[in-house]
Amino acid sequence: MSDSKVKLSTVPLNWNEIYYTNCPLVSASNVDQELGWTKEEFKKIGVKYAFMRSVRENDWYPHYIHNLDNLIRFGGLFPPIHVHADIRRTRLLGVTHAPREGGCLIVRSRDDIYRMCELKGKKIGLSKSLNTIKNDWWRIQEHQGIELMLRMNGMTMDDIELVEFPYADAWYNDPKMLDPMENPSELWLKRDHKHDLAFRPLETALEKGVVDAIYTQSKPFQHLQEATGKFKAIEDLSRYPDWTLQVANIPAAITCSDVMAEQHPELVVTFMKGMIKVGRWANEHKHAAAAILDKQTFYLDVEDTYRGIEHIDMVPNLSPQNLVSVEIGKDFMVRHGYIKNDFNVHHWAAPEFLEMAAKELINERWEKITGDKLPQASTARLG
């Protein structure tokens, strides 16, 4: 079936319901799966808050093309850039950056290859989704990482042979994948995500010698692959001091539809209040947060997750540095034709929702602290 004939499915719009979706990466949203604090915030205002896939009617496509007005997404950077550029207008509410996960290049562990320059004339794999409905974020991440690592070693794409690996990438509305689930990590009850090669599609080609090297994420994925004893990294962008190299589908971005932002800003503020609260807790309890994130992410284990998040600020923000990181990702997509329409990242960013959420939390905390210490006023004296 051609992509133009694919039937997309979402629930009817109801502003008394807000859905969320997230990627299996480091974010306050993933930690909140166990805490439930954002759900509590929505309950205070009488709104249902649930995972996008908690109802069968929602297929997986809203995670990639945001075709659900009452959805808030917290996940990898490239899909929401594509959505805002070429599909529909959204708002960028905040980001969380993993500043030392730029990506690395791995080869077979027993190959006589130790430096990037030894890959001249050799084959590097590059995935290619055949699904034109959604963004090919795997490929963009690989392409950007490979290009950067070559450049850091005085090389260009002309020095190597790129080998494409097309795949159908068409499971997003497959009935077998649409059983409802309350939490994102329930997907991993069906699949061992840390060892499922569906999440590392080029690894088999590397192992069999079809290619000589592939891109992988620094730390997540990398440590899982190295633990097999079959692979080793010969270059790692995370070891460079240049923070602009850390662009592996990150920073993770929070986005909502322009319809939600304009017609129901209180819902956006409520979500951001939850993310701030959970992010603060995660910053103060990194080991506990690591144990939660280990169930969903691609670090090797809990301790590896802790080392990965130890220096990450889990409270979403829109700092000048992080907005430049977003811009770097967007500019790469424009330059290489992954999006058709350019846009201004600073116009996309909507810091007012984060600011309002922070103010409301401060006011609520102040009222609680002072209210608990004040006597009940006498009605007679008030009169």
Locate each region found by the language model.
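Pocket-lining segment of extracytoplasmic ligand-binding domains
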Residues: 171-294
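Secondary-structure end/capping motifs
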Residues: 262-340
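Conserved C-terminal helix/tail region of periplasmic/extracytoplasmic solute-binding proteins
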Residues: 2, 334-383
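Short, glycine-/small- and polar/acidic-enriched structural segments
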Residues: 3-175, 375-383
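Short, solvent-exposed loop/beta-turn-alpha elements that line the ligand-binding surface or hinge
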Residues: 39-44, 240-244, 315-321
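Short, surface-exposed acidic
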Residues: 44-52, 155-162, 266, 297-310, ...
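Short beta-strand->loop
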Residues: 91-99, 161-165, 230-248, 344
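Second-shell loop/turn segments in exported
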Residues: 25, 130-136, 259, 279-280, ...
